[in-house]
């Protein structure tokens, strides 16, 4: 069962507020062409990733908070345009894949341990006041391409709106 899944979605399971995405499981607020995600929250245009929070354009990554344009990153926060990072430290391609294989991400026990570490990363990450992207004269949070909006939340591609939740051009 998924709630509020609209606009060109395929294979969305146990998720809420998903648009223009496919192969999504256990996610909330996923938009703009995301694909093959598990346990993502407030994600845009991510691919083949798990446990991402507030991330955009990330590929093949796990356990990230507020990361943008990252590829093959793991257990990190507040990264921009990075590749092969583990626990907020740069690594080589070989080191990265060696560490990932050593962690055995398919094991439920290993995942529970990583989730505890991820909880600490979320607690210590730096968060923006509001997530506004290409917005003008707008108040609210989780907004994309909004002009003249007042108290809008999870809204994108709209103009002259007030007191909206989950609004977008259709």
Each predicted region: which residue ranges?
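Long, distal/terminal scaffolding or interaction modules
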Residues: 1-170
């Amino acid at each position: 069962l998924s709630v509020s899944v609209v606009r060109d979605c395929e294979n969305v399971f146990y998720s809420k507020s998903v648009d223009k995405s496919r192969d999504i499981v256990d996610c909330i607020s996923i938009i703009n062409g995301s694909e093959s995600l598990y346990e993502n929250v407030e994600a845009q245009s991510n691919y083949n990733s798990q446990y991402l929070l507030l991330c955009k354009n990330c590929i093949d990554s796990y356990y990230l908070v507020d990361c943008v344009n990252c590829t093959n990153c793991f257990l990190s926060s507040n990264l921009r345009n990075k590749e092969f990072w583990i626990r907020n430290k740069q690594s080589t391609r070989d080191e990265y894949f060696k560490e990932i294989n050593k962690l055995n991400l398919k094991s439920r026990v290993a995942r529970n341990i990583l989730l505890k570490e991820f909880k600490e990363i979320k607690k210590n990450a730096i968060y923006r006041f509001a997530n506004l992207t290409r917005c003008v004269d707008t108040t609210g949070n989780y907004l994309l391409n909004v002009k003249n909006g007042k108290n809008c939340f999870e809204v994108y591609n709209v103009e002259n709106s007030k007191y909206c939740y989950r609004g977008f051009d259709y």
